[in-house]
Amino acid sequence: MAEAIGCTLNCSCQCFKPGKINHRQCEQCRHGWVAHALSKLRIPPVYPTSQVEIVQSNVVFDISSLMLYGTQAIPVRLKILLDRLFSVLKQDEVLQILHALDWTLQDYIRGYVLQDASGKVLDHWSIMTSEEEVATLQQFLRFGETKSIVELMAIQEKEEQSVIVPPTTANVDIRAFIESCGHRSASLPTPVDKGSPGGMHPFENLISNMTFMLPFQFFNPLPPALIGSLPEQYMLEQGQDQSQEPKQELHGPFSDSSFLTSTPFQVEKEQCLNCPETVPQKEDSAHLSDSSSYSIASKLERTQLSPEAKVKPERNSLSAKKGRVFCTACEKTFYDKGTLKIHYNAVHLKIKHKCTIEGCNMVFSSLRSRNRHSANPNPRLHMPMNRNNRDKDLRNSLNLASSETYKRPGFTVVSPDCGPLPGYTGSVEDSKGQPAFSSIGQNGVLFPNLKTVQPVLPFYRSPATPAELANTPGMLPSLPLLSSSIPEQLVSTDMPFDALPKKKSRKSSMPIKIEKEAVEIAEEKRHSLSSDDEVPLQVVSEDEPEDSSPRSDRVPEEQHTQLSLEEPLPQGERACHLESVIESHGALSRTLEQTTLTEREAEQKVALSSVMPREVEDGGHERHFTAGLVPQIPFPDYMELQQRLLAGGLFGALSNRGMAFPFLEESKELEHLGEHALVRQKEEARFQCDICKKTFKNACSMKTHEKNTHARETHACTVEGCGAAFPSRRSRDRHSSNLSLHQKVLNEEALETSEDHFRAAYLLQDVAKEAYQDVAFTPQASQTSVIFKGTSGMGSLVYPISQVHSASLESYNSGPPSEGTILDLSTTSSMKSESSSHSSWDSDGVSEEGTALMEDSDGNCEGQSLVSGEDEYPLCVLMEKADQSLASLPSGLPITCHLCQKIYSNKGTFRAHYKTVHLRQLHKCKVPGCNTMFSSVRSRNRHSQNPNLHKSLASSPSHLQ
């Protein structure tokens, strides 16, 4: 504080000296802090002038000190005014002012200090006196942001003092309260109470609700409890004063209304114009209880939806052109209310069309957006859960709308008198013919739009985190509520209630025709998918943020599925279109059934034509597994390789030698099943719940059912030995297909069992020993990888294979090598393909690996074999010799990655994908029992040759000789 702050009262005190107990009281003259501080502040003129000051940080600090220095609570009126000044300053300046006066931002937002410096929770607070408050109010006349509000407060203060005489004793308060209740009209449904007017300032006559203490922009546009608890006489006189300054309202952005203005209250006033005029003049104020204020606030919020309710009649009368209407959302003016409504519905209103998925409450402004959302199979978009506060408010408003439609006329507020309003020329009427504000009396009120009055408060936006804000009881509507979350049946508050169900919007005048087209398009796109596995589920796991916002523009249009037609029409359209809906729905159902049957037959024919010719060409030796028949087993790598070897040419070649595979009889029997039954079974099981086996019309309905019914059921990993569980199948499948997460489980299982899943692999090695036992294998440094271009729905596969030796190639070579069968991963490999296009994956991309292979101390480099621990017989040679049918495929055939099921157009793109994503599958430590995997041969060899890393491992098992 300044060193010389003298007292303004007639005393000899030259400098303010804070008291030891009460810091706001001077120890020398016993006068208060405000009496001294006013000596440093400019006294505004008594009569209002047009000259105002610019808000500056140092001036705001001086005025803030009048109410914050040495106090623990702020009067409500002064906090309103100070908020206006703070909103003009930067947030850093506001924080500096508060901290200099020993106030935190949380306490200032709350309006009082919660705990003292020692941490004790306060139960009583020091606050400035009423005389100091009046003196401080005058300082706010200096600024244009607060001048008009202070003038209204002064008028209210003057009339309150002239009308109400304070009681002399405390017992008279109860007597006066009872007597005032006796004179109250029976037409008012809510009990009102003036309380003890002498001991309570009208602006402190608020309900005990913390919502008023939060920053203004957290409400839309005003705390509901505050609206319901305002003294009516004050609000009426506020509007009267505002009506006398229309020109100032046009030019001054901050001076057209006080903070306590509200559109919802204005609309309720419209409904009260026909109230009986026999109500006594004593009913000039109302203090609503906590319980009633919430229900009233709910009604008041819902009245602000429609453009008719949002258009301010005073703005219409003050517009540049007579008859133009004003959109409060974007500040644009329009020729008439019809044009405004079209603009409002198209730009600002997003509540026209409800999602057709059962249980989803999302609503949209256009059918296209609604259909795009409804066709998305992601169940998280349709779950009846609280996505955020906006959706919660939307659902609450929807429930309130349905329950309050027929019991609206419960809340009325009677204005003291109903004469013509001075200062407004001409009558303003709404679209339904009811007078809007033309008959409000001299004490009537007009509440201008709060949006132009209340600026954005920067000091509330950035520094205050949600955790710092007060935990406020009661309903706290979020910002987007009134602009986008109220159903259409509340669009016009002043129209008769019996006419509400008949109101239709322009966009939904022909809903059946549009929905039929959307259903047909969705049905075509749904059947274009080959199987359910190809449909992206888009299920976001629980630990991932959901970035599918209710804004439907982000939903891909490719994921349309069949729309559900059982969803009832909105309340406003049900009565008018019930008969047409029934007829059209029946026709649609029949059309969809015929379309489904026709497309099923076409799919069956395609499936037959794709399977039968190949069986005839191969003489029945080659077995083809369609996409629907690929076994879903815990070890996809080994089992799929086994099935393809045994179902392909290798099985036929070995069978010609008289070797039998008794355990593969089941795979032979599968071939005798009718393709018609298989295709039909696949089609029926496409949309079947895996848990309860219920069938659904489309994938979206099935996913929604799974989330709503089986939400708590987890999906366990399909790999045996892995106990991981996931909340969604998509997360489970993504985890199960990642072999890097299951290397330990896979290798342990491979070592423990030789009869379970790998019997074919072990048997193949025994067969190789018997058939080629006279051949001597010469070890050489080489490593290859084989791509089998199979013809099943799974596409081609890639597997790491063991050593390939040049001597064995020469011994086995009874014919030319299969073209395109072997793709060399190493530049030092002795095996080359005849075709240059299939010779190598990347000659320079793996040069490091080829060089690293020569660094082995023992002269050879063992790759990961088909069966762990037994890797000396070149199975790839057997496969190349036996499966001649694989070589006949064209080189440009799309390649499917066996690990992630992605399809690539050529070897180049597949090679790049496999080496960058799945290369860890190729290089395993050579020490038996060590399951460490490496991305390069050099790293693997360096690890394998380090004995210190394998001390704890048991001795390696003997290899086959």
Curated annotation (Swiss-Prot):
<keyword id="KW-0539">Nucleus</keyword>
<dbReference type="GO" id="GO:0006356">
    <property type="term" value="P:regulation of transcription by RNA polymerase I"/>
</dbReference>
<dbReference type="GO" id="GO:0042060">
    <property type="term" value="P:wound healing"/>
</dbReference>
<dbReference type="Pfam" id="PF12874">
    <property type="entry name" value="zf-met"/>
</dbReference>
<feature type="modified residue" description="Phosphoserine">
    <location>
        <position position="505"/>
    </location>
</feature>
<keyword id="KW-0804">Transcription</keyword>
<keyword id="KW-0479">Metal-binding</keyword>
<keyword id="KW-0597">Phosphoprotein</keyword>
<comment type="subunit">
    <text>Interacts with HSF2BP (via C-terminus).</text>
</comment>
<dbReference type="GO" id="GO:0005654">
    <property type="term" value="C:nucleoplasm"/>
</dbReference>
<dbReference type="GO" id="GO:0051276">
    <property type="term" value="P:chromosome organization"/>
</dbReference>
<dbReference type="Pfam" id="PF00096">
    <property type="entry name" value="zf-C2H2"/>
</dbReference>
<keyword id="KW-0862">Zinc</keyword>
<dbReference type="GO" id="GO:0006357">
    <property type="term" value="P:regulation of transcription by RNA polymerase II"/>
</dbReference>
<dbReference type="GO" id="GO:0005730">
    <property type="term" value="C:nucleolus"/>
</dbReference>
<comment type="function">
    <text>Transcriptional activator. It is likely involved in the regulation of keratinocytes terminal differentiation in squamous epithelia and hair follicles. Required for the maintenance of spermatogenesis. It is involved in the positive regulation of oocyte maturation, probably acting through the control of BMP15 levels and regulation of AKT signaling cascade. May also play a role in the early development of embryos.</text>
</comment>
<dbReference type="GO" id="GO:0030154">
    <property type="term" value="P:cell differentiation"/>
</dbReference>
<feature type="compositionally biased region" description="Low complexity">
    <location>
        <begin position="826"/>
        <end position="844"/>
    </location>
</feature>
<dbReference type="GO" id="GO:0050679">
    <property type="term" value="P:positive regulation of epithelial cell proliferation"/>
</dbReference>
<feature type="zinc finger region" description="C2H2-type 1">
    <location>
        <begin position="325"/>
        <end position="348"/>
    </location>
</feature>
<feature type="region of interest" description="Disordered">
    <location>
        <begin position="937"/>
        <end position="961"/>
    </location>
</feature>
<keyword id="KW-0805">Transcription regulation</keyword>
<dbReference type="GO" id="GO:0007283">
    <property type="term" value="P:spermatogenesis"/>
</dbReference>
<feature type="region of interest" description="Disordered">
    <location>
        <begin position="810"/>
        <end position="864"/>
    </location>
</feature>
<feature type="compositionally biased region" description="Basic and acidic residues">
    <location>
        <begin position="548"/>
        <end position="560"/>
    </location>
</feature>
<feature type="zinc finger region" description="C2H2-type 2">
    <location>
        <begin position="353"/>
        <end position="382"/>
    </location>
</feature>
<feature type="compositionally biased region" description="Acidic residues">
    <location>
        <begin position="531"/>
        <end position="547"/>
    </location>
</feature>
<feature type="modified residue" description="Phosphoserine">
    <location>
        <position position="509"/>
    </location>
</feature>
<dbReference type="InterPro" id="IPR040436">
    <property type="entry name" value="Disconnected-like"/>
</dbReference>
<dbReference type="InterPro" id="IPR036236">
    <property type="entry name" value="Znf_C2H2_sf"/>
</dbReference>
<protein>
    <recommendedName>
        <fullName>Zinc finger protein basonuclin-1</fullName>
    </recommendedName>
</protein>
<keyword id="KW-0221">Differentiation</keyword>
<keyword id="KW-0863">Zinc-finger</keyword>
<keyword id="KW-0744">Spermatogenesis</keyword>
<keyword id="KW-0677">Repeat</keyword>
<dbReference type="GO" id="GO:0050673">
    <property type="term" value="P:epithelial cell proliferation"/>
</dbReference>
<feature type="region of interest" description="Disordered">
    <location>
        <begin position="370"/>
        <end position="393"/>
    </location>
</feature>
<feature type="zinc finger region" description="C2H2-type 6">
    <location>
        <begin position="923"/>
        <end position="950"/>
    </location>
</feature>
<dbReference type="InterPro" id="IPR013087">
    <property type="entry name" value="Znf_C2H2_type"/>
</dbReference>
<dbReference type="GO" id="GO:0005634">
    <property type="term" value="C:nucleus"/>
</dbReference>
<feature type="zinc finger region" description="C2H2-type 3">
    <location>
        <begin position="687"/>
        <end position="711"/>
    </location>
</feature>
<feature type="zinc finger region" description="C2H2-type 4">
    <location>
        <begin position="715"/>
        <end position="743"/>
    </location>
</feature>
